[in-house]
Amino acid sequence: RRSARLDGAGSVDVIQKRLVDYSRTLSAGSWVVGRGWMPTDFPGRTADRRYLDVVFPDRPVVIRDRDGHQALANTPALELAGITRDSLDPPDGWIERGPDGEPTGLLKEAAASLVTGLLPALTIDETYQLLREELGTAASFGLTSLQDATDVGLTRSESAAVMRAVEMGTMTVRYRAP
């Protein structure tokens, strides 16, 4: 998925700036997605939706952390997902709540999919283009093989994009998926 790169941000200010800059490339009202943040980017290592709400009070935002085990969603994204203080934690995940019982926006493990599952699906062409970009990134680091560490495998669009890359000779790494 195309997203704002948050790797190495180091602070909330940098995360906010990168998200705002990225949002300018999107159509009005579309989701703002980012990835790569670290807990240490937030004061007291406490990620909270309010840091996103300040710059996006009316537009849904979700950012995945660097290791993929949690996501931070702003208030509009939580509202679209129907996440409230009364929401039950999903199996294999949990919704972080503040002392007042309200969701903080931090969604751990499977709870992240409550919001990320609302993102529009990518077409095969979009997925293939993203794959090509990521293969270029992998090559820049000298990587020659990659493994999907998830237990769910690839989506249909992702599988089709990988097959297209293999058929067109643009798959520059060995790839293993469950």
Regions found by a protein language model. Name each.
Residues 1-178:
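Divalent metal-binding segments
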